[in-house]
Amino acid sequence: MCNCKYREDKLHHECGVLGIYGVDDAAGLAYYGLHALQHRGQQGCGIVTVGPNGEFHRVKGDGLVTEVFNETSMTKLPGKMAIGHVRYSNAGCKGTENLQPFLFHHNSGDFALANNGQIVNYHQLRDELEDKGSLFQSSSDAEVLAHLIKKQGIDKELPRIHSLKNALNMLDGAFAFVVMTGRRIYACRDKYGFHPLAIGKIGEGYVVASETCAFDVIGAEYIRDVEPGEIVTIDHHGIRSQFYAEPERHAMCAMEYVYFARPDSDIEGCNVHNYRKESGKILFQEAPADADIVIGVPDSSLSAAQGYAEASGLPYEMGLIKSKYVGRTFILPTQSLREKGVKMKLSPVRSIVKGKRVVIVDDSIVRGTTSLKIVKMLREAGAAEVHVRIASAPLKYTCYYGVDVHTPEELISNRNSVEQVCKLIEADSLAFLSHEGMLAAGHRSDLCLACFNHKYPTKLYNE
């Protein structure tokens, strides 16, 4: 887990993955696909391709997709197969060595891999592998799979698919892997189904991606999701499926719907915008407010705010405007400058909020500092009352499955009641969506709500 001196008052996802098979200029399509997944990770990115002679090529670096790749670097990535990755560091510290995809050389054939998620028994597996002579090139938990694959192949002389199946069965936690050999791509998802991974068709080839929004930008057609516990093999035969493990449960991360995924993505048959809008409607049913207008915190909360307004009959207004030009890192050297951070990112529309009783809808509250500043900002702009409504339950506990949730002590709802949080953020009222409401918004019978209810689907090896 990376430790930053100054941490934003928002959650971050670990990463996004992409795979392209059987398409001319696979790297070019990977570039646009990764750009569509940029919201899942902004610290670094990379692409690996397999050239016409079976050789592997890689370009990776710190920064956004548009910063790492240019016309010159793209010419270094020939071939009809590619995998790519965008990263926000979680398990493993910052550093170029931790940027994915990883590339490995082995006597049974080179391969590359990239992952979205977090392996909870990483430290135990790494210790065992290092005791047996494995040398790690990074501190990323994703590298464990590569060493397990190699170890299986050496010890048991297994075909690659059997080595992969055995290796995946040794992992516990959340993962959505893309693994590329010289001839095929494997798409693998953990048996709990924590994070999304979808398959699409493009021309005579195929694409896999963390979100379906990547399909739209490259002109691919959605086929289906990779199922929990499934390995999908993509090669000249087309797509083939086998399960390395029986699915445990459909424990899709609730925050994928609430915050991380793009509104135009579909996750397991549910459109993200529709989920958020429905959550806003349910939020009104659970926690109505006597108010004049409804506004949302840009951008991820706008759909929920629309739903709340629709259900309440109140006007939906653009009461907050988000600046497009604030840098993504935004780490300032003094407290006084950091206090101005929210005002640089968000500005109230005075003519809309002045004299109004305002319902402000947000997706979540992490530390509460941003909520406090937004409430103050609206009051300074003339709002008569500010009623805060959150389109998820109180965030109380650490995530071990690929979301950079702060330590429990940093989470304002971990140590305070709803009434206390309301006072701390200086709102006139505060209400959160219930656990039941989060499920109902997507017509789901199950989601991973561990960061809300402390019910973890897996054993926690590091507790």
Go through each PLM region and give its residues.
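PRPP-dependent phosphoribosyltransferase catalytic core
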Residues: 168, 183-184, 201, 219-225, ...
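Flexible loop/turn segments at secondary-structure boundaries
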Residues: 25-27, 90-91, 121, 186, ...
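Conserved short alpha-helical segments that host acidic/polar catalytic motifs at enzyme active sites
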Residues: 1-228, 233-291, 297, 385
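A conserved beta-strand->alpha-helix junction
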Residues: 69, 138, 143-146, 316-327, ...
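Secondary-structure transition/capping motifs at alpha-helix termini
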Residues: 134, 155, 286-292, 310-317, ...
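Short, glycine/charge-rich flexible loops or terminal/linker lids adjacent to PRPP-binding catalytic cores
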Residues: 313-358, 369, 396-406
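Phosphate/diphosphate-binding loops
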Residues: 166, 213-214, 221-222, 226-230, ...
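Generic beta-strand/beta-sheet core signal
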Residues: 114, 180, 188-189, 200, ...
